Amino acid sequence: MSAAAVLAVVAAAVAALAAAASGYELTKNGTVITYDRRSLIIDGHREIFFSGSIHYPRSPPDTWPDLISKAKEGGLNVIESYVFWNGHEPEQGVYNFEGRYDLIKFFKLIQEKEMYAIVRIGPFVQAEWNHGGLPYWLREIPDIIFRTNNEPFKKYMKQFVTLIVNKLKEAKLFASQGGPIILAQIENEYQHLEVAFKEAGTKYINWAAKMAIATNTGVPWIMCKQTKAPGEVIPTCNGRHCGDTWPGPADKKKPLLWTENWTAQYRVFGDPPSQRSAEDIAFSVARFFSVGGTMANYYMYHGGTNFGRNGAAFVMPRYYDEAPLDEFGLYKEPKWGHLRDLHHALRHCKKALLWGNPSVQPLGKLYEARVFEMKEKNVCVAFLSNHNTKEDGTVTFRGQKYFVARRSISILADCKTVVFSTQHVNSQHNQRTFHFADQTVQDNVWEMYSEEKIPRYSKTSIRTQRPLEQYNQTKDKTDYLWYTTSFRLETDDLPYRKEVKPVLEVSSHGHAIVAFVNDAFVGCGHGTKINKAFTMEKAMDLKVGVNHVAILSSTLGLMDSGSYLEHRMAGVYTVTIRGLNTGTLDLTTNGWGHVVGLDGERRRVHSEQGMGAVAWKPGKDNQPLTWYRRRFDPPSGTDPVVIDLTPMGKGFLFVNGEGLGRYWVSYHHALGKPSQYLYHVPRSLLRPKGNTLMFFEEEGGKPDAIMILTVKRDNICTFMTEKNPAHVRWSWESKDSQPKAVAGAGAGAGGLKPTAVLSCPTKKTIQSVVFASYGNPLGICGNYTVGSCHAPRTKEVVEKACIGRKTCSLVVSSEVYGGDVHCPGTTGTLAVQAKCSKRPPRSAATAQ
């Protein structure tokens, strides 16, 4: 089949997939959502659901349509989101449903895209979100205890749940009203907390279920990680491998639903990079459907950014960047494409999955077949599983032999033909690159505003004998609290030898501190996500007479999980000085003054009005407790923008007055690098000219070395073997509930052939082939190498098929590239890396 013919088939198949992806059957007059053990039922019809979490406050509203469209293009038919109480009611009785918190707009966009929705109201959501979504003011309600049979908590929880349900009803967003919402969630992962509260926990969860049902949404309610969910509430699974770790609801009338399949591991400051492969995620989903599951949600499908102070304790601004759509909303391949292909394969099997008789057939040690079959209608699907993590294998199923890669599942959509293998990736790969934006260096002039004098005890208004707990003072309005005290030393107190210095020892409940003695910087200390409490010990110089200690304590968000959140603490609790001639001096009860927040925060220097009210000076390097600013024009084009803060220490970033999050590049993980140093600047924040980049730096750094970059995924790759099944999206179609080969798709002498397809981003074409090898190449996208077997003609063939095209197809076959099938070690693998870019203007191209 010619490349042009294959591309025509591809285009038709993609269009058909987009049209059919949602299986959307809601009506404007309202839809009845029920369920049985097999699935949710939409107006009497069973359905399978592929869902993805996209949290509306973690992405700018102008990006929502694109994110939802890409999710649908990826084969999803459901979008899932939490509701964030502290975002919607930051002050008691003061509500916010605008901008990134316009949840009505978000769910209406889902409806416009003809997709279903799941709303996870909570209102405790965890979600690596500040305080788990609970507003700080709730802590100050008398006698309150969160998430137990506590009347004050239940009162305010019911008020908020009712508020959200009523707003969604007013907008007619529940399926019973013709809207997209087919499920609603109450509470979140409560089962492990129920043990802590014992009988009160059981009473609370039963109350929560009854309260939710009484809101009369007309759709089922769910509880995640609550195996024995009360009454008609459906329990759901959260985890990486729910097909193996979760037996399903105890009530056999309820379906197997998976609300969180973690597409990566969320990261905190101090974490090294972590990944979860596309193959492992695909295996977990195929496994879940093979044991009777009919809804799987990817948490996250797009993580986005924890803007401002929204991240929970120690959680970085960058959230689930390894999701199928990365932090910037770009396709992360092959994860996005491999899961899209899985969804397409499972849709071929929908009738068998929803109505077939399930059975299990052992095929050998660590091998099995799980079958759903309607013999009378000749409808069948089989999942051939290899649970051996080290070895590939061959099994015999219904008289035919099948190769099954290690730890994989092959899907036989007619119980005969392999249409998908979780281990064999047919979708393209890509590599993300960052590019210096030349135009942003113009007028690279930094100015600074240093915090007013470091506070002294005598100038403070909040004074106590001992240091105060921090959260009770800052009330989640700021990360910062000053602790200061003064003490007198005599000559006999100080060490006689110059090489001996007193040591300042500060113990803190968390999270980090910067210490000053007599206005001189002494040092920093911090805890970790796991161990927030810490002790800092730093040598210092003291003098005869009065000495002043000032400690700036900072938090990195409130805790988002566990029992008794309302009692969690932060801040300094003991201070001593060791190494004096007269022994250890305990300053803990010396009398302490406190100052809430920074001078720059009170002056709002990050705002246009505030920055004009203070005197800015020429910027200098390595200045602690300093606000820095500069102007810049945005990079040209539409590529995402990031700021590289590698040369800085710890602080908070603003662009045009909007808080983009905490940074902490001085804190290195075990591999010797910061957990995050690139920070997303949404294009919607940028003006055509004269943007303000500002940050508060706690420790000191070199602002002149900060870079503004753009983000691309223009390096596209493929890595496929002849053992890959033919591409499910355009090689197969469903006809009479059975998969049929698309006429001629990829067909050759050996029948259907695996075919690699390379496709550039919008408005770009393949301009060069960086690498091409057929045989046994090695490596990953962006770093391929030729193996011991290599067909020399490979690059020539690929260039002829691909250069100048937006999309090209490459049949994976030794005949095409002149590969030596007898070469020892050959794996019949094609590896290609190509570079996409915009075509140069015709005049420029002619001149060259």
Swiss-Prot record:
Location in or out of the cell: Secreted, Extracellular space, Apoplast
Provide the reaction this enzyme catalyses. Answer: Hydrolysis of terminal non-reducing beta-D-galactose residues in beta-D-galactosides
- What positions does UniProt annotate as the active site of this protein? 189, 260
Q: Where is the signal peptide?
A: 1-23
Cellular compartments per GO CC: apoplast; plant-type cell wall; vacuole
What molecular functions are annotated in GO for this chain?
beta-galactosidase activity; carbohydrate binding
Q: Which family does it belong to?
A: Belongs to the glycosyl hydrolase 35 family.
Instruction: Extract the PANTHER family matched here.
Output: BETA-GALACTOSIDASE RELATED
Name listed for the protein in its UniProt record: Beta-galactosidase 11
Q: Which species does the entry assign this protein to?
A: Oryza sativa subsp. japonica
